[in-house]
Every structure is written in structure tokens, then in C-alpha cells.
């Protein structure tokens, strides 16, 4: 987070807010975050299931009032109904580190691209090298999301399982992504157009 980012936060209103649970995580040395950068416990960054990579956010611990600006650089959390995974530095800055989990408000101040509610969206929940495993997840999801169209995309070496919400609507896709359990796949939004 740069000095310019901190100045931007001071002089602008958030474009979107969410409340939920945050926890912290760490990763093996050398592991890359979803944005392609090497993960660092010392960076003020976080993981979110659907916000665009590079989004500038402020996380406020609703119990302690501590807050910090950070960037979205990774995908997650994929455990339970948590909203954010924080690096150790972010967790310490917001008072989440010692307690492990805390209720937070996430304020989005800037995204690399506007959060576009238009267009056609779906939720990708799995990528497999095995067609059988992709079919198994597809069948499991069809039982829970009968109104959604679950499709497979054969790639060079994988099959992708996606849930298409009614009308390919972004808000409906975000709702599905937030409700998916970890056993149902690691959900993230992707555009169809």
C-alpha cells in the first residue's frame, strides 16, 4: 500500500462495503498468490473470493475499531462462510492476529477495473485433469443449484466446472460464490463475454 493509496482513502468514500468474518493465513515459502506475486506474510494484503485483484480496501475490526488499508492479491477464504483471509501483517494491523477470527467491515475504495455488474458472469468452482471428477462435482452441484446451469469446458489438460446463475447476473454469481462450501470447489467469478 503506497502513500498515494493512503491519501486516496482519506479523501474518498468507499464504493462498496461488506461485513463478515476475517481470519489470517500464511503460506509455504515461495508460494505464489493468485495475482502471480510471491506470497509474503509481511505485506498488507488479503484474499477475497470475488473482488478484482489489486483492489484497494480498508478492513476495520468491528470489535477493536482497528483498521488498515491493504490490497487484494489472493483468492479465498475457502473455509466456512468467512469473508477475508488476511496476511499476518494485515491481521496484526487490524487486531485479528491474536484473536484468530474477528467480525470486520471491508470497504472497497478502488479497483483496477470498475466492478461491472453488467455483462455475463458465472462462478468457476473446479478445474480437473479427470473428466470423471469434473462430472462428479457437476452432479453434486446440480442437486444444490437446480436453477443454475452447470457446464464443463475442456481445456488443454483440464475440465472446468462452472455454475451459470439465472441471467448470467454478476450479483447472483457473487451470491453463489459466497454460499459454496469448500468441498464444493474453490469459487471465483469469471466473465462469459
PLM segments and residue spans:
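Extracytoplasmic
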Residues: 129-193
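Secreted/periplasmic proteins
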Residues: 1-122, 127-139, 179, 191-193
Amino acid at each position: 500500500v503506497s502513500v498515494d493509496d493512503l491519501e486516496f482513502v482519506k479523501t474518498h468514500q468507499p464504493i462498496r462495503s461488506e461485513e463478515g468474518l476475517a481470519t489470517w493465513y500464511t503460506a509455504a515459502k515461495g508460494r505464489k498468490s493468485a495475482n502471480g506475486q510471491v506470497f509474503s506474510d509481511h505485506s498488507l494484503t488479503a484474499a477475497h473470493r470475488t473482488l478484482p485483484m489489486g483492489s484497494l480496501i480498508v478492513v476495520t475490526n468491528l470489535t477493536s475499531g482497528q483498521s488498515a488499508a491493504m490490497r487484494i492479491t489472493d483468492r479465498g477464504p475457502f473455509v466456512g462462510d468467512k469473508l477475508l483471509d488476511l496476511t499476518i501483517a494485515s491481521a496484526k494491523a487490524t487486531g485479528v492476529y491474536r484473536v484468530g477470527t474477528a467480525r470486520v467491515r471491508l470497504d472497497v475504495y478502488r479497483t483496477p477495473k470498475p466492478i461491472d455488474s453488467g455483462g455475463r458472469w458465472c462462478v468457476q468452482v473446479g478445474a480437473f485433469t479427470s473428466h470423471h471428477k469434473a462430472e462428479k462435482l457437476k452432479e453434486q452441484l446440480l442437486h444444490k443449484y437446480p436453477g443454475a446451469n452447470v457446464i464443463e469446458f475442456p481445456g488443454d489438460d483440464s475440465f472446468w466446472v462452472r455454475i451459470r446463475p439465472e441471467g448470467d447476473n454478476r450479483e447472483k454469481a457473487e451470491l453463489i460464490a459466497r454460499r459454496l462450501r469448500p468441498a464444493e470447489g474453490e469459487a471465483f467469478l469469471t466473465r462469459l463475454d
